[in-house]
C-alpha cells in the first residue's frame, strides 16, 4: 500500500482554463444572495404548465411491477455538527425581513459538537447538499428528522418555521425512510418500498407533483406509478430518481440542459422575457452519448443507472458497467469533458471507460465532481475556488493515494473525507467552521488537513451542506463513547 500522505489536493491540473475564458457567466455567481438570486432576476420564470399537457405520468401495470424492500443503511452512530448554523443567513448578505426575528440565532461552530437533543438517538444516515441550508437524519428505525432553513417548507413539518435542532417529520411517521436528498429549497424522501415523497419549493416543478406552486409544506408523493425507485438526488432546483431497473428520470428546472432531455427549456415569452418550460413530473432520460475525438456523436446503448449525484446545475450518473456520464452546466470543467460546453444529454466521461478504470462511487460539489475508481484512486474535476484555475477533466488526487476512502462530501467550496481512521478536510476562505479545525485554529486551508478535533473518532459517514458539516461518529466501544462525551454539546437557542 502506498505511503499515506496529506498534502496539496487542491485539484489543479489537467487542461487548465482560467475564469472568464469566453464562457458565458454562470447564473449561480450572479448574485451575492445565491439562494434567492432567481427570485431577484426576471430571467428565470417557469413557463405555462399547459406546455406539458402531452406528458403522462410513468405507469407500469401492477402485475409487472417489482416488489422490493429497501433496507435502512447498516451504519449507526451519533450525529456531530460543525460550521455555520445561522440557517437564514447562509449564502446571503443579510437575513430576509420575514425572518428578522431569527437574525441572531445560530453561530459558527468551529469544531465538532454533539446535539444535546439527540443523545439517545442512533443515526444511520445523514443528508444535506452543496446548495442546502437544511439537513436530514434517518434513524436506525427508518424515521426522518429535519432541521435548518424552512422558507419554503423544505423541512416537511407543515409550516415555514425555521428549526434549530432535528425534529421528527410526523407526516412520514408511518413510513420507513431509507434515503433522502436536499436541494436548495426542496427535499426528496425515499421509502423502503420505493415510493418517493417530496416537499418544499415547487416553483419550477422540482417536486414532481404535476404542478407549479410556490411551496408544498407537507410530504406528498410524486406523480409516478412506474417501477419502484431505489435512488434519489437533488440539484439546486431539479431532481433525479432511479428505478429498480436502472432507468433514470428527472424533473424540475431544465436550465443548462441539466435534466438530460436534450433541451435547456428556454423560450421567449411576452416582453422578450426568457422563461423555462419546466418538467412537472418524472420524465425518463432516454439518450446517453459519447463524443469521439473528431466530434462524432455516438449513442451509448445498454446504460443501466446504479447511482446518481447532483451539483447545483450538473449531474453525474454511474452505470452497471462502472461508466460515468455527466451533463448540465459545463462551466469550470465540472463535466470532465475538457471543454466548458453545456451538455444537454448524458455524455460519457472517457477516463472511466477502460478495463480496470471504472468508477465505484460518484460525488458532486456545487461546481465540481469526484469519482472513486475501482482501484481505489480518487479523481477530481471542476473547481472548488473560482479564483483558481479549473481542472477540465478527471485528474487523480495523488496526495490522497493510499487512503481507503469510504465517504466524501462537498459544500459550496469545502470538501470533507472519511478515510481509514481519519477525517480530512480542506477549503478556501471564506469558511464558517465546516472544516472542523477547532477554535483558535486556522479557519481555512487550500491543502488537505486531518481534522485533529476528531482524532480517535471513527467517521462512518460525512456530509456537507452549503457551509456546514455533519458526521456520523461510531460509538460501538466504550473507548469511542468516552471520546464522544468529551466533545462539546450543542444546545441551540430557540425562539
Curated annotation (Swiss-Prot):
Keywords: Cell cycle, Cell division, Cell membrane, Centromere, Chromosome, Cytoplasm, Cytoskeleton, Membrane, Mitosis, Nucleus, Repeat. RCC1 repeats lie at residues 76-138, 141-192, 194-244, 246-320, 321-374, 376-420, 421-474. It is a peripheral membrane protein. Residues 1-56 are annotated as: Disordered. Residues 31-40 have a biased composition (Acidic residues). Disruption phenotype: Morpholino knockdown in single-cell embryos does not lead to gross anatomical defects, but causes subtle defects in the migration of neural crest cells, so that cells populate also the pharyngeal pouch, instead of being restricted to pharyngeal arches. GO terms for biological process: cell division; chromosome passenger complex localization to kinetochore; neural crest cell migration; positive regulation of attachment of spindle microtubules to kinetochore. GO terms for molecular function: small GTPase binding. Residues 291-298 are annotated as: Required for interaction with RAC1. It is found in: Nucleus, Nucleolus; Nucleus; Cytoplasm, Cytoskeleton; Chromosome, Centromere. Its main location: nucleus. One of its GO terms (cellular component) is spindle. Interacts with RAC1. Interacts with CORO1C. Multifunctional protein that may affect its functions by regulating the activity of small GTPases, such as RAC1 and RALA. Required for normal progress through the cell cycle, both during interphase and during mitosis. Required for normal attachment of kinetochores to mitotic spindles. Required for normal organization of the microtubule cytoskeleton in interphase cells. Interferes with the activation of RAC1 by guanine nucleotide exchange factors. This is Protein RCC2 homolog. It comes from Danio rerio (Zebrafish).
Amino acid at each position: 500500500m502506498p505511503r499515506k500522505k496529506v498534502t496539496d489536493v487542491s485539484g489543479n491540473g489537467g487542461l487548465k482554463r482560467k475564469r472568464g475564458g469566453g464562457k458565458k457567466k454562470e447564473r449561480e455567481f450572479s448574485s451575492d444572495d445565491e439562494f434567492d438570486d432567481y427570485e431577484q432576476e426576471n430571467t428565470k420564470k417557469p413557463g405555462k404548465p399547459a406546455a406539458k399537457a402531452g406528458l403522462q405520468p410513468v405507469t407500469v401495470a401492477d402485475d409487472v411491477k417489482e416488489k422490493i424492500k429497501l433496507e435502512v443503511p447498516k451504519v449507526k452512530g451519533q450525529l456531530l455538527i460543525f460550521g455555520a448554523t445561522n440557517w437564514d443567513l447562509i449564502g446571503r448578505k443579510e437575513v430576509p425581513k420575514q425572518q428578522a426575528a431569527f437574525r441572531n440565532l445560530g453561530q459558527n461552530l468551529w469544531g465538532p459538537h454533539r446535539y444535546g437533543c439527540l443523545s439517545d438517538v442512533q443515526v444511520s444516515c445523514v443528508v444535506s447538499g452543496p446548495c442546502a441550508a437544511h439537513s436530514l437524519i434517518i434513524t436506525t428505525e427508518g424515521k426522518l428528522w429535519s432541521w435548518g432553513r424552512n422558507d419554503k417548507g423544505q423541512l416537511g413539518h407543515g409550516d415555514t418555521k425555521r428549526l434549530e435542532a432535528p425534529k421528527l417529520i410526523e407526516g412520514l411517521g408511518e413510513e420507513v425512510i431509507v434515503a433522502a436528498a436536499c436541494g436548495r429549497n426542496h427535499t426528496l424522501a425515499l421509502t423502503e418500498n420505493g415510493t418517493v415523497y417530496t416537499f418544499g419549493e415547487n416553483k419550477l416543478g422540482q417536486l414532481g407533483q404535476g404542478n407549479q406552486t410556490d411551496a408544498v409544506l407537507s410530504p406528498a408523493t410524486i406523480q409516478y406509478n412506474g417501477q419502484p425507485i431505489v435512488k434519489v438526488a437533488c440539484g439546486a432546483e431539479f431532481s433525479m430518481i432511479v428505478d429498480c431497473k436502472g432507468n433514470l428520470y428527472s424533473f424540475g428546472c431544465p436550465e443548462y440542459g441539466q435534466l438530460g432531455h436534450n433541451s435547456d427549456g428556454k423560450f421567449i415569452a411576452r416582453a422578450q422575457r426568457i422563461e423555462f418550460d419546466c418538467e412537472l413530473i418524472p420524465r425518463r432520460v432516454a439518450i446517453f452519448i459519447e463524443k469521439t475525438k473528431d466530434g462524432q456523436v455516438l449513442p451509448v446503448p445498454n446504460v443501466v443507472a446504479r447511482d446518481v449525484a447532483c451539483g447545483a446545475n450538473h449531474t453525474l450518473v454511474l452505470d452497471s458497467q462502472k461508466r460515468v456520464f455527466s451533463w448540465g452546466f459545463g462551466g469550470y470543467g465540472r463535466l470532465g469533458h475538457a471543454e466548458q460546453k453545456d451538455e444537454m444529454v448524458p455524455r460519457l466521461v472517457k477516463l472511466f471507460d477502460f478495463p480496470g478504470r471504472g468508477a465505484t462511487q460518484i460525488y458532486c460539489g456545487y461546481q465540481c465532481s469526484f469519482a472513486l475508481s475501482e482501484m481505489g484512486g480518487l479523481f477530481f474535476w471542476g473547481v472548488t475556488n473560482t479564483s483558481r484555475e479549473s481542472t477540465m477533466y478527471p485528474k487523480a488526487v495523488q496526495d490522497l493515494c493510499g487512503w481507503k476512502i469510504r465517504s466524501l462530501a462537498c459544500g459550496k467550496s469545502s470538501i470533507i473525507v472519511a478515510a481509514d481512521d481519519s477525517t480530512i478536510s480542506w477549503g478556501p476562505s471564506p469558511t464558517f467552521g465546516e472544516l472542523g479545525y477547532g477554535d483558535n485554529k486556522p479557519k481555512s486551508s487550500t491543502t488537505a488537513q486531518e481534522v485533529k478535533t476528531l482524532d480517535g473518532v471513527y467517521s462512518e459517514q460525512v456530509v456537507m451542506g452549503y457551509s456546514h458539516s455533519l458526521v456520523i461518529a461510531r460509538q460501538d466501544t466504550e473507548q469511542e463513547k468516552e471520546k464522544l462525551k468529551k466533545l462539546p454539546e450543542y444546545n441551540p437557542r430557540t425562539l
